[in-house]
Amino acid sequence: MNRYVMFFLACLMGHVASAQTELRLSLSCPVSYEAAPVVVDLAPYGTVRSALVTVDGRETPCQLDDLDNDGQMDELSFVADMKPGQQRVANVKLMKTATPSEYKAQTYAEIVLRNQNVDKKNKHDIYLSAISIDKQTTNPYNVLHHHGVAFENEMIAMRIYMDKRQTIDLYGKFHKGLELRETQFYTSKEQKAQGYGDDILLVGNSFGLGALRGWNGVEPTMLDDVQHRTQRIVTQGPVRTIVEVEDAGWVIKAGTEPVNMTIRYTLYTGHRDMDVDVRFNRDISNERFSTGVVNVKNSSEINDGKGLRGCWGTDWPAADTANWKLETVGMGVYVPAKYLEHVLPATKENYGMVVKPIGKYIHYSLAYTSDNENFGYHSAKEWEGYMKEWKNRLENPVMVKKLSGGKAATPKQSKSTRSRR
């Protein structure tokens, strides 16, 4: 469920120096929206070192994030459950001093370098926050343990292959909880017996779950000609994790000028969906790209012809059928109308769509479920119902309005805005 709210508070007045800034926000939504994320842009408020958020008088976990690694906090995020037509009030205190509050982690991300001295596949111990691989590397897929950055919340977990496919591979959980630190995407027999999840999808050269590829007018194309491939962990904590994949010097088609592309994946606690934000270093409106989901063997397709596409199906997650069980998954992608060029006919490999940038930007959303979950969906009909509700939430975002009554740098002028989903 993509319940993402982006609220950027614009401060048109001069910043008043203070050790504390207080904001009062009104939250409302026309539809039911569990764990709706609210994001406050901290740029108008100077240095922020800690924060406290209450919703209707109850403290709620929040997270401060430095998104560009400049030592300054850029955004504050928290989530709130919303009922149709309900208005809730969030009080936000931003402080220049004090120790940040500690809340239980509900998201996690890791980039792990292979350690040749470690035998067990779930015990590698060289952790990175980012890595860049040069074009001269012939097989980047095998540089990293679990082949790329992995990230999760309590409901879902994924990894992104660090090669020309940049496929998103899926991990299915039986119970809610963070698992990747223990399993590293390679669950042992002992861990399986304890109820840990495992890899659930065979992706091959398909889109997997929503990989972004080129488009040559006939079929999707891989990211073959890239000067530098980078993966980084931007943040992780009690509210959200953000990871990025950067392709510097990508020659999309032979004879064209290279472009730099950064794909940001944002996953919030309480969600089985995530945002995908794609940014280029120049206007690329005339170019076309492709995305979609893998056509799982004997799957049922879900397609409204208007940007919502997915499937429900069952297949082996690996070629080794002796040591794996059949896995049933539901996957979905939603591309807003302004980024959708057209829906492609289903192929043996993919349910695809052609997408178009607006200037330097593309946005879409992804979701999935595993039939293993004791908290998820267990039939094609249930999954299709979820996807329709998911799209409805995306098209009816939470409204956030600044109320009077704040202190210090709080602007007198109110401003409401729709969420960026």
Each language-model region and where it sits:
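Bacterial Sec-dependent N-terminal signal peptides
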Residues: 1-23
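Short, well-ordered beta-strand segments enriched in hydrophobic/aromatic residues
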Residues: 23-27, 155, 274-282
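Solvent-exposed N-terminal domain segments of exported/luminal and surface proteins
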Residues: 96-224
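Beta-strand-rich recognition/accessory modules
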Residues: 67-82, 331-421
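Acidic (Asp/Glu-rich), glycine- and aromatic
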Residues: 261, 272-305
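Solvent-exposed beta-strand/loop surfaces of large extracellular or lumenal domains
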Residues: 52-76, 251-256, 297-316, 335-339
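Alpha-mannosidase-like glycoside hydrolase catalytic domains involved in N-glycan trimming
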Residues: 20-123, 128-130, 134, 138-139, ...
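Extended, loop-rich substrate-binding clefts of extracytoplasmic carbohydrate-active enzymes
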Residues: 193-268
